[in-house]
Every structure is written in C-alpha cells, then in structure tokens.
From Swiss-Prot:
Its main location: membrane. Its EC number is 7.1.1.8. Pfam families: Cytochrom_B_N_2. It is an enzyme of class 7 (translocase). InterPro entries: Cyt_b/b6_N, Cytb/b6-like_sf, Di-haem_cyt_TM. It catalyses: a quinol + 2 Fe(III)-[cytochrome c](out) = a quinone + 2 Fe(II)-[cytochrome c](out) + 2 H(+)(out). The chain crosses the membrane at residues 45-65, 118-138, 146-166, 189-209, 217-237, 266-286, 335-355, 381-401, 418-438. The lineage of its organism: Bacteria, Bacillati, Actinomycetota, Actinomycetes, Mycobacteriales. The cytochrome bc1 complex is composed of a cytochrome b (QcrB), the Rieske iron-sulfur protein (QcrA) and a diheme cytochrome c (QcrC) subunit. Binds 2 heme groups non-covalently per subunit. This is Cytochrome bc1 complex cytochrome b subunit.
Length: 549
C-alpha cells in the first residue's frame, strides 16, 4: 500500500517559489527598497488618485458597454421596449444606446456610472492640476509631469466629448454640428477639405460616429493609459513633493511607507471612489437620451449645454461678437476664433512652467512646495484663469439664466462679454493684494507673536493687546523676530495649546465619564475665577473715592 501524502502547504509552496526566484534574479533587495518608499500624508495628494481610480472605473464600465453598443449610423426603425419611440426612425447607434438603457441587464446603471466617472475623471485632473499650480509642484525637475498632466486634461476633454457624442441623440448631434462641423467649415482655405475628410461628405454623413467610436475606445484610451503610466513612473522615480514643516527638507520625504500604510489607505480610497460612483450611477440620473430623441438636422433645441469641462468653449462661442475678418479673399467667421483661443489655451497650459522659469530666472531644483500666499503673482494668475473659466461656463447657460431669472438674453450675452474682459483683471488685483496681506499677517506673528485677546492698560493710560511670542525674547521682553520658513503659522492661542487638548468623544460618541467630569470641573473652576475677578474689580471701584457717592 502506498503511503498517503499530506496536502501541500500553500504558504510553504509560495515561499519556496519566491526563494527560487530570488536565488536566480535577486529581486528582493530592489523590491524591499521600493516597498520602503515614503509618501507624504497630506490630503491634497489624494486628488491625483481620484483621477486614477476614476479612469480604472471608466475602463471597466467602458469594456462592458462596448459589448452591446453598435456605432453604425444606418437608419433603422425602433421597435424596442420604450413605447414613446416605437416606430421612430433613428440610427443604429441610438437604437443600441436605448437597448443598453432598457433591455441589457444593468445597462443603464453601468452607462450612468461610466458618464459620472468621466465627469469625475476630468474634475479630478482639473483640481489636481490646480493644486500643483498653486503650490509650485511643477517647478524643476517636474516640468515633464506638468506637461503630461496638461495633456491628460486635454485628452480627457476630447475623450469625453467624443464619448457623449456616440449615442447620436439630439443633444450630442447638436454638439457635433455646433462645435465640430461649423468650426471646421469656417476655417479658411482648408475648412471644406477638412470637413469632407472628417464627415465623408456633408454633415452628418454616415462615417463620423464609427470614427469617433474608434478614437473613443482604442486610440485615446491607449494614449491616456500610456501617459498615466509615465506620470506614475516619474512620480515614483523623482520622489514626491511635500509641504514645508518640521523635519522636512529639500532632500528627504516625511510620511508613511508604501507598505503597509499607504497601500491599505489607497485600497480603501479606491473602494470609496467605486462606492461613490456606484451610488451616483444608481441614484442620480444623467444624460437621459430617451427624453432627447434621435438627432435630426432640422431640429434644434434650446437649453443645450455640453458637460462642464467643455462648457467654457460653448460660452466662448455664445458671447463672441459676430466679427468677420477677410484675409487674402478668404472669410474668417466668428466661430473660428473659438478654435484659435482653444488652441492658445492648450499651448499656454503645458508651457507655463517654462514661461515662469524664463521670467523669474528660477532654475533650481525644488522638492518643497510653496504656499500660494508666498507667490502672489502666480496665485493671482491662477485666480484670474479660474475667473475666466467661470465666466465662460456661466455664459454657456445664458439662455437658461435668462429664462429662469426673466432677464433679456441679449443682456446675459453682454454681461458675459463685459465679465470676460473686466472680471479676470479685477480678480487678479484682489488676489494679489490678498496674498500680500496674508504675508504681512505672517510677518506680524513672527515679529510680535500671537494675539492673546488680553487687553492691558499702561500706566500712562494707553491700551495694548498682549502677544504671546513664538520664540525667545530680548532683555527688554520684546520678541526676537523669527525667520519665515514657508510653513503655516499659529494665529490663535488655541493653536499653542492654551485651550487644552480636545476630548476623546466625537459627533457620534460621548466623552468618557471621567473625562466629562473633569471638563465640567474645569469649566466650573474657570467660571468661579471669573466671578471672583469681577467681584474684586467691583469692590475696588466701590472703595475708590469716585465710587463712594
């Protein structure tokens, strides 16, 4: 009888395999070094992870939708389950989008998650770039990562635009007609040829959506995926930036190791992002194409706006004056200038680090971030750009604003035009002066200390507020001014611990009984001291010659 073999131990098998690999290729040293890499713990560094995890959700949901979507523009008659559109002639693309929404199991849920994830992806990139811009994280040696992030934002905008154009509903068709077709036709010399190359003839043609589909599911996602991989590789190789603080220098990183803290935190954050997108996809309706109907070139609807990341271009087209220019017997209509300004923005965005380096002469390596107040010109430029974006975004919905607030549509158009010219410089000035004021506030704390709120009367009758110095004092008791290190400064006594430590309770859990009793006793003692001081003050007044009458 053969001996009975015991089942193998999985842990021992894996350990043996790992040892065999290590004896051949020696990866353990490099792997240990990489797993010990330190990442900062500031919350703003998670903004980039939101974009990354949203893109992962986009890939997963996009693959599912690809299994059921047909990008053909062949005309068919709808005979599906949605009764109001039965018998209506539409494209095969629109019919398959309706089938995904009403007949594919989980199709509407996945489609809405996909759309919300696209919005979150673009929004996260915008906020992430804003954080990098205002803190100076794009400075040398990280200019390449800024360029990659700018390209990711531009690609995300066009990827989203192509994506919501695929269903061939009335709203997406209007977007293609107004943005892609009209601007292309208006280009001098090459406009007609380029339009026929894109559409295969007159608008809308029969080949545009299949071409957009190929760009949307193959080319652009591949480029975005490659850029994300390159971005992460550069972050890993160049190490992370960090905010100034105790123990932080240009040559180290203070934070937590990749394993296990950062890895578990990132995994939990990914689960949270997926959960939030799932709730949004299940509870918040977005892009109800069945209410819009199929695209018909003869039908135009008011209240037509693109997604938020393209609304600034729509607003620019709405408020741009109807100026026509003539150059070498060619007409340049107003919509072409929208494309020109878009191109200018798309060039200035990735080029900004090099422009700032050129004008400031700062060619040094930087691993410590800056507070926005410490760089008022850059902060003011960023605030001006945000104001420009917000004005154009609001201008994109001027018809809805005019309808809801009973304002003339022409008035909203002129408000947008005036705001585009006046508001950005005004915001620049206010932001610049605000930063200067914050700098002076920091210098005041370093020179005089923190305001205590205690008013003291001097022997000659003047009143002053006492300050708590942050450092040593001279022989006269005056604070010795400290040097600003770029880190946040305490502005209130509570920051120095004068209010004591907070209780262990929270919004959901009360303090412990012993801690609650101690807090009550301390509060009662403080009240008794205040009453005693008040009585002493009143007695001194009553006992004075002025108080005897």
């Amino acid at each position: 009888m053969s001996p009975k073999l015991s089942p193998p131990n999985i842990g021992e098998v894996l350990a043996r395999q790992a040892e065999d690999i290590d004896t051949r290729y020696h990866p353990s040293a490099a792997l240990r070094r990489q797993l010990n890499k330190v990442f900062p713990t500031h919350w703003s560094f998670l903004l980039g992870e939101i974009a990354l995890y949203s893109f992962v959700v986009l890939l997963i949901t996009g693959v599912y939708l690809t299994l059921f979507f047909d990008p053909s523009m062949v005309d068919v008659t709808y005979n599906g389950v949605y009764q109001p559109l039965r018998g209506v002639e539409m494209s095969r693309a629109y019919q398959s989008a309706l089938d995904i929404s009403f007949e594919v199991r989980g199709g509407l849920f996945v489609r809405q998650i996909h759309h919300w994830a696209a919005l979150m992806f673009a929004a996260a990139i915008m906020v992430h770039l804003a954080r990098i811009f205002f803190t100076g994280a794009f400075r040398r040696p990280r200019e390449t990562n800024w360029v990659i992030g700018s390209l990711l934002l531009i690609l995300a905008m066009f990827e989203g635009y192509f994506g919501y154009s695929l269903p061939d509903d009335l709203l997406s068709g209007l977007g293609l007609r107004a943005a892609l077709s009209s601007i292309t036709l208006g280009m001098p010399v090459i406009g007609t040829w380029l339009h026929w190359a894109l559409f295969g003839g007159d608008f809308p043609g029969t080949i545009l959506i299949p071409r957009l589909y190929a760009l949307h599911i193959l080319l652009l996602p591949g480029i975005i995926l490659a850029l994300i991989g390159l971005h992460l590789a550069l972050v890993w190789f160049q190490k992370h930036t960090q905010f100034p603080g105790p123990g932080r220098t240009e040559h180290n990183v203070v934070g937590v190791r990749v394993m296990p803290v950062f890895a578990f935190k990132s995994g939990a954050f990914f689960a949270a992002i997926v959960g939030v997108l799932g709730l949004m996809g299940g509870l918040l309706q977005i892009n109800p194409i069945w209410n819009l109907g199929p695209y018909k070139p003869s039908q135009v609807s008011a209240g037509s706006q693109p997604d938020f990341y393209m609304m600034w271009t729509e607003g620019l087209a709405r408020i741009w004056p109807p100026w026509e220019f003539y150059f070498w017997h060619h007409t340049i209509p107003a919509p072409v200038w929208v494309a020109v300004i878009m191109g200018l923005v798309f060039v200035l965005l990735p080029a900004y680090p090099f422009l700032e380096k050129r004008f400031t002469g700062d060619y040094a390596h930087h691993n410590l971030l800056q507070r926005p107040r410490d760089v008022p010109v850059r902060t003011a430029i960023g605030a001006m750009a945000i104001a420009f974006y917000m004005v154009l975004t609001l201008a994109a919905m001027n018809d809805i604003i005019a309808l809801k607030f009973h304002i003339s549509l022409n008035a909203t158009t002129w408000i947008g035009r005036i705001g585009m010219v006046i508001l950005p410089p005004f915001v620049y000035f206010i932001t610049y002066r605000w930063c200067i004021g914050l700098q002076r506030s920091d210098r005041s704390v370093l020179e005089h200390g923190v305001e205590t709120g205690i008013i003291k009367r001097l022997p000659h009758g003047a009143y002053i507020e006492l300050h708590q110095p942050l450092g040593p004092v001279d022989e006269h008791g005056h604070p010795i001014p400290l040097q600003y290190q770029g880190a946040p400064l305490p502005k209130r006594m509570n920051k120095l611990g004068s209010a004591g430590s907070p209780g262990s309770g929270s919004f959901l859990f009360a303090d412990s009984a012993a801690e609650d009793a101690a807090l009550r006793e301390a509060g009662h003692a403080a009240e008794q001291r205040a009453l005693a001081a008040l009585r002493e003050h009143q007695d001194s007044i009553m006992g004075s010659p002025d108080g005897e009458h």
